[in-house]
UniProtKB/Swiss-Prot annotation:
GO terms for cellular component: cell outer membrane; pilus. Residues 19-46 form a propeptide. A lipid is attached at residue 19 (N-palmitoyl cysteine). Belongs to the bacteroidetes fimbrillin superfamily. FimA/Mfa1 family. A lipid is attached at residue 19 (S-diacylglycerol cysteine). PROSITE patterns: PROKAR_LIPOPROTEIN. This is Major fimbrium subunit FimA type-2. Structural subunit of the major fimbriae. These long, filamentous pili are attached to the cell surface; they mediate biofilm formation, adhesion onto host cells and onto other bacteria that are part of the oral microbiome. They play an important role in the invasion of periodontal tissues. Fimbriae and their constituents are major virulence factors. FimA proteins from different strains have highly divergent sequences, and this has been used for classification. The sequence-based classification correlates with pathogenicity. Synthesized as palmitoylated lipoprotein precursor. Efficient export to the outer membrane and integration into fimbriae requires lipidation and subsequent proteolytic removal of the lipidated propeptide. Residues 377-386 are annotated as: Important for oligomerization and fimbrium assembly. The record marks 46-47 as: Cleavage. Keywords: Cell adhesion, Cell outer membrane, Fimbrium, Lipoprotein, Membrane, Palmitate, Signal, Virulence.
Length: 386
């Protein structure tokens, strides 16, 4: 592994070029201590890509702070530990991040690092390389070798022995794991549904990287739908991105269909902003043939389809939302928010016609049942009846 050292005196400008090296610029090159850090990561689980990718640590970075000033920074590729970080003895703060990409961390103060944010992008829809953070931790380093989270066999000063530092994904995962059309007796001989697309709606655009809650005050949101709905949940600052939409593929536990999203608190700022996972398609006759013009007019007047000559309909699921149509199993998580490092797996049962506006509140008697599992990741299963 190539190692590069940058002497800050007279060469500070060169430090910024080190962000993609295995070993980042180390602000302190002379010291009487080293620290090695080993991590505990969440168990791998099924990814949108290859299994295990969601837990992959492609680049691990450890920063050591003396007060506000960065004393050392070091990275390792494809590793869950960083060893022999040169620093000095005394009270220090450790900050650990993974999969930071091109983020420039060398030389940042502790306050600057804690204030970092991230955005939801097309690049973070890949299972591999999900950004992860651990909350800053206070440690006391002694002269010589220090070890954080090791088993004690190394000797030296053992900190948090046998309890590695836990690092968590900044993103959450929302996905359908089952979609079943079982029309109720009232509709069984009248209607069916032909799915076409899956979208994420009202997805938070930005997130903090550190803090008890990562939901920030920025009121910008993203949608995968090209349609403007102007519903009660529609944000004012709303941007379409095609990568929050996908063609319909039958989901399963082994092949979940969904997206990675950021932490969000639904009642924050301008009003209720629930993150929505939505399936779009066509309302048809019970045998799958197109509706007649009279049937489309009736369905449009009922608010089920978008126009009297267009049978497009939507089945929105408000993820981790409180509703009599929703039941939950798995990890307990407070409703009304998207929480980092959780996967929200949704089992959807369609029992009747959908809606022409997925960004409006749905009545409790709507034809949707949701069962959501939250998992560790932390896992939530949401069962939905429509």
């Amino acid at each position: 592994m190539k190692k590069t050292k940058f002497f800050l005196l007279g060469l500070a400008a060169l430090a910024m070029t080190a962000c993609n090296k295995d070993n980042e610029a180390e602000p302190v090159t002379e010291g009487n201590a080293t620290i090695s850090v080993v991590l505990k990561t969440s168990n791998p689980n099924r990814a949108f890509g290859n299994a295990g990718d969601e837990a992959k640590v492609a680049k691990l970075t450890v920063m050591v702070y003396k007060g506000e000033q960065q004393e050392a920074i070091k990275s390792a590729e494809n590793a869950t530990k960083v060893e022999n970080i040169k620093c000095s003895a005394g009270q220090r703060t450790l900050v650990v991040m993974a999969n930071t990409g091109g983020m420039e961390l060398a030389g940042k103060t502790l306050a600057e690092v804690k204030a970092l944010t991230t955005e939801l992008t097309e690049g973070n829809q890949e299972a591999a390389g999900l950004i992860m953070t651990a909350e800053p931790v206070e440690v006391t380093l002694v002269a010589g070798n220090n070890y954080y989270g090791y088993d004690g066999s190394q000797g030296g000063n053992q900190i948090s022995q046998d309890t590695p530092l836990e690092i968590k994904r900044v993103r959450a995962r929302i996905a359908f794991t089952k979609i079943e059309v079982t029309m109720s007796q009232s509709y069984a001989n009248k209607y069916n549904f032909a799915p076409e697309n899956i979208y994420a709606l009202v997805a938070k655009k930005k997130s903090n990287l550190f803090g008890a809650s990562l939901a920030n005050n920025d009121d910008a949101y993203l949608t995968g739908s090209l349609t403007t709905f102007n519903g009660a949940y529609t944000p004012a600052n709303y941007t379409h991105v095609d990568w929050l939409g996908r063609d319909f593929t039958e989901p399963s536990n082994n092949a979940p269909q969904g997206f990675y999203v950021l932490e969000s608190t639904y009642a924050q700022n301008a009003g209720l902003r629930p993150t929505i996972l939505c399936i779009k398609g066509k309302l048809t006759k019970h045998d799958g043939t197109p509706l007649s013009s009279e049937e489309m007019t009736a369905a449009f007047n009922a608010g089920w389809i978008v126009a009297n000559n267009d049978p497009t309909t939507y089945y929105p699921v408000l993820v981790n939302f409180e509703s009599n149509n929703y039941t939950y199993t798995g990890e307990a998580v407070e409703k009304g928010k998207i929480v980092r490092n959780h996967k929200f797996d949704i089992n959807l049962t369609i029992t009747g016609p959908g809606t022409n506006n997925p960004e409006n509140p749905i009545t409790e008697s709507a034809n949707l049942n949701v069962n959501c599992v939250v998992a560790a990741w932390k896992g939530v299963v949401q069962n939905v009846i429509w």
